[in-house]
């Protein structure tokens, strides 16, 4: 004979896995060609000189050098470049 009333199930209690987005290499850091600089959704950061952009908007180094963050243009867009 049960001495506790049966508990109803809940429909909550789930969450998606984190996607590990964000800046992976910061300003002034040395990078090798192919290194991922930023993982992002959309273009929060734009590709500058010697930086490529993947189909998921990931920015990566096209050449070896140092990472440089800069704000340019009338809309104050953030660009990431690689200086040799």
From Swiss-Prot:
GO molecular function: structural constituent of ribosome
Region named Disordered: 1-22
Gene (name only): rpmA
Family from the record: Belongs to the bacterial ribosomal protein bL27 family.
Source domain of life: Bacteria
PANTHER family per UniProt: LARGE RIBOSOMAL SUBUNIT PROTEIN BL27M, RIBOSOMAL PROTEIN L27
NCBIfam families listed in its UniProt record: L27 (TIGR00062)
Pfam families for this protein: Ribosomal_L27 (PF01016)
Protein name: Large ribosomal subunit protein bL27
Single Gene Ontology BP annotation: translation
Organism this protein belongs to: Shewanella oneidensis (strain ATCC 700550 / JCM 31522 / CIP 106686 / LMG 19005 / NCIMB 14063 / MR-1)
Cellular-component GO terms for this entry: cytosolic large ribosomal subunit
PROSITE patterns attached to this UniProt entry: RIBOSOMAL_L27
């Amino acid at each position: 004979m049960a001495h506790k009333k049966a508990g109803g199930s809940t429909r909550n209690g789930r969450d998606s896995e984190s996607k590990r987005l964000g800046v992976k290499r910061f300003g002034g850091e040395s990078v090798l060609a192919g290194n991922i600089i930023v993982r992002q959704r959309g273009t929060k950061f734009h590709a500058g000189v010697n930086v490529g952009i993947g189909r998921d908007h990931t920015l990566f180094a096209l050449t070896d050098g140092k990472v440089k963050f800069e704000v340019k243009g009338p809309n104050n867009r953030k660009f990431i470049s690689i200086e040799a």
